Each structure stands twice: as structure tokens, then as C-alpha cells.
Amino acid sequence: VCLSYSVRSSVETQKEYLVEQISCLVKRLGGTVTCIGEYPAWEYREQSPLRDKMIEIFEKQYGRKPIVQALHAGVECGLFAGQLPGLDCVSFGPDMKDIHTPKETMDVGSVERTWNYVLEILRNL
């Protein structure tokens, strides 16, 4: 039996702890553990001038507040922030459902809205 896990967390120490717990359990059951690749944690920043600016632009462009939330998903921001400490990162994109499943869908109209939003962000940086 081979089990594969993609362990992710927004807090590096919690991710390391979870990997250690899985490893201990597998070894206790007589198995072996091999760790291949990882996404570094991307920790939530209380202060983010970039996020604040993006919220301001979104509200002006769409007349409503954006949904802002911290996620545990492994995204490229963790890779960039891991290489450039102090980097202010924000992840956003089009509306998607059932990500990483055979039922994954993306709202095509939201792709255009996202593109227009990116252009406005770049104009305001």
C-alpha cells in the first residue's frame, strides 16, 4: 500500500509538526516514509500595504468589498516569500469550483474581470 500526502499549512511549524506525526504513525505501523518536494508555508500578514491597495482598487472598480481570506493551500506566494523574506504577496484569481477534481470549473466571465483588475492594479502601483 502506498499513501501520498500533500501536507500544507499557512504556518511552517504546524506543517512540520503534521509531517512528523504522519511519519511517526507510518513507522510505528512498519512502513517507510519518503518526503518529496514541498510548498513552504505562506503566513498571513496582519499588515499588507499591497492587500490594502488591492482592496481599495477592487472597491472602486466593482462597487463592493472583495472576499479576503487566509487559506492553507499551497500557492506560488509561499515559494516567492520563502526566497524573498519580507515580500508582500497577495494571491487572487478567477472564480473556480471543485479545484483539483474531475469536476473543476472556472467562470469564464470572471477571467475577464480578473484581467481588468490586474491591469488596474498595475496602473496604480
Predicted regions and their residues:
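Conserved strand-to-helix beginnings and helix N-cap segments that scaffold or border functional pockets
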Residues: 16-19, 47, 104
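Structural signal for hydrophobic packing residues in well-ordered secondary-structure cores
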Residues: 22, 26-30, 58, 62, ...
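Active/binding-pocket-proximal capping segment
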Residues: 21-29, 37-40, 50-52, 95-96
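A short beta-alpha structural unit
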Residues: 3-11, 32-51, 78
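Zn-dependent metallopeptidase/amidohydrolase metal-coordination segment
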Residues: 65-120
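Short secondary-structure junctions
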Residues: 30-34, 65-68
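N-terminal/domain-start segments enriched in small and hydrophobic, helix-friendly residues
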Residues: 14, 39-70, 110-123
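Long, well-ordered mid-to-C-terminal structural blocks that present hydrophobic/aromatic surfaces
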Residues: 1-23, 27
